[in-house]
Amino acid sequence: EERQGTVFLVIAALGFLTIGARAGFVLLLAAALVLFGGYRALSLSMERDARMRSYFGVYTVRDGPGYRELDHGSTVHGIQLRGSVARERTPTTYYAVGSGVGQAMQAAPALYGPSARIGVVGLGTGTLSCYARPGQRWRFYEIDPAVVRIARDTGQFTYLSRCLPNPEIRLGDARVALAQDRSNSLDLLALDAFSSDSVPMHLMTR
């Protein structure tokens, strides 16, 4: 980030000096666009499985220091720590142990017994699967096959393989799937189909 700041200052200074020279200014502007975002976007597009497009948008898998992240547009779909099995099994971001959903999942055995039936709308990277306990029955509802592929099949994220190797995944619109399920088939249902700060009221109400 410090290096980027220095480069930005240099480009800004050169830009000021070339304001009168149209060709030089355009060339400098193009270089700035490539340096700040464009190059990274192009390199991600060329990496195998780093970008995946589906009917629902573009998914981007990017690596940071000690973690891997899945983005859908501007929304973070999940972050997994890397470096050891224990780190890979650790729920992160808004699924962390102290979060609301984390506390609900940890309380499930006491509230519903060792055979609790857990449903999750929205698979993401599969983070919530690491709250699964022996004897529980978990079911994920996911509308996008691309998300299932990223979370389960590519090996980029290992929440499912580490914590719940053979999950039940219902592919399709969760509203339809839940309507088809028999009444009282779940003890705990987590809704994780939000898109950024846009709340899906059609899932929150009758």
Language-model regions, residue ranges each:
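Class I S-adenosylmethionine
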Residues: 6-168, 174-179, 187, 198-200
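Short SAM/SAH-binding signature in class I
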Residues: 184-192
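Flexible, active-site-proximal loop/turn residues at the rims of small-molecule/cofactor binding pockets
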Residues: 195
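A short glycine-rich, Lys/Arg-flanked "PGG" loop and its adjoining helix->strand segment in the class I
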Residues: 204-206
